[in-house]
């Protein structure tokens, strides 16, 4: 069933969430009945055609409606405003006329079964009938007109029998399209043309900064009745709804309001924060029957200004009014070692916060305008005395919606709330942000739900309560209570609101500041003798205390474990060994002189409590272990410096020569080729003593024919390292067998193939063996040494390369023209059929064919070098 009871234009308040261009928006509201009976919702759209739905307010969750609100700031001025309070948010709606505001309030109060909470000051106990009818006193409400001032009775529910005649009142709005439902038509319109006082507007003089703390003291039945009978006669200045079950509640509210007014008149003023911004709206303020002029006169004549409140109207305050310095404890909290609480501690903007306020991040759940006195967002100012705080903390009853945001938008903004420190207001000034303006907000009527017959004094809207402040703090020695409190407060995924919605019984939670609700370290600060904090997950700690839980970290491992001295081990505790005794034994084996000291220190529970300070971490707390990588702390006293699996021990126990680039080896003296054939086999079986010996045996070089000046250009290389060459005999310079045979050095850079220089000897064989792995490759020159060469290559895990250049490219011998892959990429062209062998001393130095086939190939590297060579060739052709 989608029946519309009421509709019209209203101006909706912006949200406190940091959205782009948040403003007071004009929306078209419709009051509709839901799918089931007695279910109502308030929908609002961008236009009167109801095409684009912007949001829905569930009136089943409505707890309270404040009528006659006024908002005045630099940019907005709303005279006819009311609010709808739900457990999750509070909506502030402004109408164009007072008639529209009254119509909306009456309709919402009827569908939500809300009643005026101020009736106790207007009617004696005997003035209420025993039936379900509500009594309505019609009186002056500036702007409406009626011929007589009368008293009529009407039923707020369709089930009641009596219906009052409808008062025909013209619509003063004119612009709003209103449909008056039947439930509204039963309401007589309060008006009085003869007594139209436009100044008789109720003002709230108990308005305090950020939060308003009210003392809802408990009274017994006799006190309630006596206080109700002492009230002045009913004033004709309100339009009210009551039933018989609401009288006791109303009497209690009246008595509490009168007492509160007397206590607060000495410090009552319109509170403005330090930067000229009022962040909180009053929630539980009781009306004082004063006009604006009377309130101003009383404020300027009898009010004694509090030194903690600023008199400046702008965003800045005089330096004389800035109170800072050493923060103090909350009122009523005894100092460590003291038996009595602080008797007089004037509340200043800073001293009701925790001492570590500036070092601790602010609470996530307090971002936005918060109305609770115990969940402050930033330094707060209160006008209450210590006695009021004590009374308030002793028997405070709070509503479910007290902790909710004041100004909220209709749209569901799902993104997280950014911190206020990160908002650059100079780049995005908002014309609707309440916190950027100084404003005055008052109300003239309040409607809330009434208890059942014979029920408690407190209405159901206030069934969830907390014991507040110092009166409910545990004793200094109650460590278990503080531990439980820390566990409750450390879960920041559940906001304080979730606690209120889910709790069925009052929780003994001390009323701490917003920083205390965030960090368990501050909870530990309450207990002076407790030096350690509860482990938490995502809350950085203050610099005031060590971050780690020293009892947990040091109680399980010795001081000499690598975790204490190794920064890597300290940063990765999840990989540490569980066997701490083995770790201590390893450390003692590495340092035998420290074994006794290690045992002595490890046995002392308080000997090592120096852990890193001034550090934040978001890592989850885990059990600390002894080392990072388990093999790092293995016993390696008997292990050789070289891993035997990777580098087997060679014959003779000599170290293996590293495979270095050719540029890193020193120059080698030339060795005759005649020595090569006799010693190649022995060189493979027994490695030379040093790298020079290896190079001499593996690099036969007939350097006797001349120096570097006598060499042909083909023998010169562009590298800076000296070259060891074997020049053939003059008689064999043009031998056909050596015409196409060249040995090129093994290089890691790609090289191009080259041809003989026209002026160079065609049979010259150049061998460049620069590494230890190349020495084993020379065994392939003889047939007898070939099996040994292959076995040695497999043993050493070394690779052998030969580059046979048989192409007909230009003979320019260039460093970039050599390629390791030439031997294998062109092996099918005849290079594999070439055989070479050393000759005897004094014989011809030209290479001769042999039956040895070069098959020691690393295919991975061969393919890699082949690709490099091809890329070089392709880039050179371009």
From Swiss-Prot:
Phenotype upon changing residue 104 to A: Abolishes function in photoreceptor cell development
Modified sites of kind Phosphotyrosine: 801, 854
Superkingdom of this protein's organism: Eukaryota
ATP-binding recorded as keyword: no
Biased composition (Polar residues): 160-169, 707-718, 760-770
Domain PH residue range list: 3-113
Biased composition (Low complexity): 136-159
This protein's record includes keyword Acetylation: no
An individual GO BP term: signal transduction
Membrane spanning residue stretches: none
CDD domains recorded: PH_Gab2_2 (cd13384)
Any one annotated GO CC term: cytoplasm
Pfam families, A to Z: PH
Subunit record text: Interacts with DRK.
Name under which the protein is recorded: Protein daughter of sevenless
UniProt organism field: Drosophila melanogaster
Lineage start: Eukaryota, Metazoa, Ecdysozoa, Arthropoda, Hexapoda
């Amino acid at each position: 069933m989608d029946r519309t009871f009421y509709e019209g234009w209203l101006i909706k308040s912006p949200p406190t969430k940091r959205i782009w261009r948040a403003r007071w928006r004009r929306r078209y509201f419709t009051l509709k009945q839901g799918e089931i009976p007695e279910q109502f919702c308030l929908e609002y759209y961008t236009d009167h055609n109801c095409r684009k739905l912007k949001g829905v307010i569930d009136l089943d969750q409505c707890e309270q409606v404040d009528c006659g609100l006024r908002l005045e700031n630099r940019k907005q001025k709303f005279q006819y405003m009311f609010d709808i309070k739900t457990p999750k948010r509070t909506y502030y709606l402004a109408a164009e006329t007072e008639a529209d505001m009254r119509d909306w309030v009456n309709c919402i109060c009827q569908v939500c079964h809300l009643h005026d909470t101020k009736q106790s000051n207007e009617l004696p106990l005997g003035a209420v009938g025993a039936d379900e009818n509500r009594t309505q006193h019609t009186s002056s409400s500036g702007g409406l007109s009626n011929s007589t001032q009368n008293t009529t009775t009407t039923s707020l529910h369709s089930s009641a029998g009596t219906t009052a005649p409808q008062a025909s009142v013209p619509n003063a709005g004119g612009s709003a399209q209103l449909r008056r439902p039947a439930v509204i038509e039963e309401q007589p319109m309060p008006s009085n043309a003869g007594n139209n006082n436009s100044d008789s507007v109720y003002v709230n003089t108990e308005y305090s900064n950020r939060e308003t703390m009210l003392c809802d003291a408990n009274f017994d039945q006799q006190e309630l009745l006596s206080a109700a009978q002492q009230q002045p006669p009913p004033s004709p200045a309100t339009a009210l709804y009551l039933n018989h079950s609401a009288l006791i509640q109303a009497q209690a509210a009246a008595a509490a309001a009168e007492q509160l007014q007397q206590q607060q008149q000495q410090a009552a003023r319109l509170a403005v924060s330090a930067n000229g911004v009022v962040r909180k709206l009053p929630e539980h303020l009781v009306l004082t029957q004063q006009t604006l002029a009377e309130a101003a006169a009383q404020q300027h004549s009898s009010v004694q200004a509090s030194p903690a409140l600023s008199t400046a109207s702008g965003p800045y305050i005089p330096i004389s009014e800035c109170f800072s310095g050493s923060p103090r404890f909350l009122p009523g909290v005894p100092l460590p070692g003291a038996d009595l609480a602080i008797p007089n501690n004037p509340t200043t903007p800073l001293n009701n916060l925790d001492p570590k306020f500036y070092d601790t991040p602010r609470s996530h759940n307090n971002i936005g305008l918060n109305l609770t006195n115990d969940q402050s967002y930033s330094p707060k100012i209160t006008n209450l005395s210590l006695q009021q705080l004590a009374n308030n903390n002793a028997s405070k009853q709070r509503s479910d919606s007290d902790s909710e945001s004041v100004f909220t938008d209709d749209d569901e903004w799902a993104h997280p709330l950014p911190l206020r420190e990160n908002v650059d207001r100079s780049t995005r000034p908002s014309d609707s942000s309440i916190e950027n303006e100084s404003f005055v907000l008052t109300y003239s009527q309040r409607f809330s739900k009434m208890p059942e017959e014979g029920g408690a004094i407190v209405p159901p809207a206030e069934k969830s309560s907390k014991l507040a402040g110092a009166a409910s703090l545990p004793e200094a020695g109650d460590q278990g209570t503080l531990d439980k409190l820390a566990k409750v407060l450390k879960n920041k995924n559940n906001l304080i609101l979730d606690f209120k919605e889910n709790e069925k019984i009052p929780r003994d939670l001390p009323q701490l500041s917003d920083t205390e609700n965030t960090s368990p370290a501050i909870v530990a600060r309450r207990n002076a003798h407790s030096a350690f904090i509860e482990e938490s997950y995502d809350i950085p700690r203050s610099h005031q205390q060590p971050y780690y839980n020293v009892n947990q970290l040091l109680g399980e491992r010795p001081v000499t474990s690598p975790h204490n001295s190794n920064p890597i081990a300290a940063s990765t505790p999840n990989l540490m060994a569980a066997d701490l005794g083995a770790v201590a034994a390893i450390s003692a084996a590495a340092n035998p002189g420290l074994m006794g000291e290690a045992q002595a220190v490890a046995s002392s529970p308080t000997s090592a409590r120096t852990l890193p300070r001034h550090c934040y971490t978001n890592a989850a707390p885990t059990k600390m272990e002894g080392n990072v990588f388990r093999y790092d702390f293995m016993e390696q006293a008997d292990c050789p410096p070289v891993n035997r699996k990777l580098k087997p021990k060679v014959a003779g126990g000599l170290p293996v020569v590293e495979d270095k680039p050719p540029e890193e080896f020193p120059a080698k003296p030339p060795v005759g080729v005649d020595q090569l054939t006799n010693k190649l086999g022995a060189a493979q079986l027994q490695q030379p003593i040093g790298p020079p010996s290896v190079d001499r045996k593996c690099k036969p070089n007939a350097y006797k024919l001349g120096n570097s000046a006598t060499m042909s250009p083909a023998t010169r290389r562009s590298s800076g390292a000296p070259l060891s060459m074997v020049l053939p005999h003059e008689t064999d310079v043009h031998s056909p067998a050596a015409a196409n045979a060249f040995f090129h050095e093994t290089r890691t850079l790609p090289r191009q193939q080259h041809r003989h220089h026209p002026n160079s000897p065609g049979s010259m064989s150049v061998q460049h063996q620069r590494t230890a792995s190349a020495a084993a490759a020379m065994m392939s020159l003889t047939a007898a040494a070939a099996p040994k060469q292959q076995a040695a290559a497999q043993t050493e895990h070394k690779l052998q390369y030969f580059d046979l250049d048989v192409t007909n490219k230009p003979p320019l011998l260039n460093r970039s023209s050599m390629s390791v892959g030439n031997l294998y990429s062109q092996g099918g062209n005849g290079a594999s059929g070439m055989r070479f062998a050393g000759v005897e001393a004094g014989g011809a130095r030209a290479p001769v064919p042999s039956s040895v086939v070069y098959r020691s190939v690393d295919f991975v590297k061969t393919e890699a070098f082949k690709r490099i060579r091809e890329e070089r060739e392709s880039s050179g052709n371009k």
